Regions:
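Feature recognizes metal-dependent phosphohydrolase scaffolds
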Residues: 2-373
Length: 373
């Protein structure tokens, strides 16, 4: 049953496939190259209540209907982007920043948090104006709605730009694992006849979905692993003192990870020492040493943290990845830890994140409550 739920979450309304009508069997990808053809359509593959595949074809080839397998049967529409660009690594200070991390495929939690903090309305429209929202990694895996979560962020990203706002999607270790084909949901099994129903080989659907040929896969590859907004550096795992010895800038970190994102350097290091480090156990995707002693290293000391702050010229570092009981600070307020256990239902008051408003930091939740850190 769990495998079926995961399968349905992967396939229910998000396998958007652009294909030329009448030319062979479409594959599990979203591509934009068909726009040069006069006869083209957007196909979406779904799984119904009987776990059978079916295909829907839309004449609006650039719009995808996303359905959510939750009790409310939520759905929304996403327009595919004309092009994908790589995000910058640094941004000037802005008056309003909201951050949340480690949603892990939990659509209800993300929905509640964004609604209650006026990032979007109930029709999934961006209403945060020129504010910035940071999604600090690990928005996939564990939960059963990873793809719906990704499509929602994808949608909000392009709407934010139109109002002068910005969505920052920072990669976490689970995004990398999925891109490498090693995510939590990679072993989903489905019957042979279900493959045949759609006439598509779904044997590696999870890997294909995050491949460089799919829309979401291409989109994730434009994302950074670390960004700085004003005085705040946002990174999913953390920053090890050892990173200073490589003397990398933010662009160097992001480009190196992006160039090596397909390779499991965590387990199989290669010649590029910087890439090995960045994608390895003490890199920004995986490092836990800002919060705790771990089996591979000790917890970062106060003096080591100060060196990290000085090197990156960043008084504040915001992280997820390592679980804490509540949004909290460390190192005399220089570190903000935001990986909490979010609620599974809508608006339970347990889904929490960070608000930075005119330089003042608040803990916020999915009921609209706020309190100073």
């Amino acid at each position: 049953m769990r495998d079926q739920k995961m399968l349905r979450s992967f396939l229910n309304g998000f396998f958007a496939i652009s294909s030329v009508i009448g030319i062979g069997t479409p594959s599990l990808i979203v591509t934009k190259d068909v726009e040069s053809h006069s006869k083209s359509a957007l196909n979406t593959y779904n799984v119904n209540a009987d776990d059978l595949f079916f295909k829907e074809t839309s004449s609006k080839r650039d719009t995808v209907k996303i359905t959510v397998p939750n009790n409310d049967k939520d759905f929304f529409y996403v327009e595919l982007k004309d092009s994908l660009i790589i995000d910058r690594s640094t941004y000037e200070n802005v008056s309003h920043i909201i951050e949340i991390s480690d949603i892990e495929g939990n659509f209800n939690a993300l929905y509640s948090f964004l609604i209650s903090n006026k990032v979007m309305d109930k029709n999934y429209n961006w209403i945060f104006g020129n504010g910035h929202v940071v999604f600090l990694g690990d928005f996939v895996d564990r939960g059963t709605q990873s793809i719906q979560v990704l499509w929602l962020i994808y949608k909000l990203e392009q709407e934010a730009v139109k109002q002068g706002g910005k969505v920052h999607y920072i990669l976490g270790n689970h995004e990398i694992l999925n891109i490498q084909g090693a995510g939590y949901n990679d072993n989903v099994l489905i019957k042979d006849e279900q493959y045949n129903t759609a006439s598509v080989a779904f044997g590696k659907s999870h890997e294909i979905l995050h491949s460089s040929k799919s829309e979401l896969g291409k989109w994730l590859r434009t994302k950074n692993s670390i960004e700085k907004i004003g005085n705040y550096t946002f990174v999913h795992g953390g920053l090890s003192p050892k990173i200073i010895s490589f003397k990398p800038g933010l662009d160097n970190i992001n480009n190196t990870i992006r160039e090596n994102i397909e390779h499991d350097l965590y387990n199989n290091p290669k010649k590029n020492k910087l890439a090995n480090f960045l994608i390895g156990r003490e890199g920004p995707l995986w490092f836990r040493g800002l919060v705790m002693k771990y089996k591979y290293y000790d917890k970062v000391t106060q003096s080591e943290f100060k060196k990290i702050q000085n090197y990156f010229k960043s008084p504040k570092i915001v992280i997820g990845h390592t679980g804490v009981n509540d949004i909290e600070t460390g190192f005399d307020g220089g570190l903000i830890k935001t990986d909490v256990t979010h609620g599974q239902e809508k608006f339970p008051g347990r889904t929490k994140g960070l608000l930075i408003e005119n330089g003042i930091e608040y803990k916020i939740d999915d009921k609209g409550n706020r309190s100073k850190l």
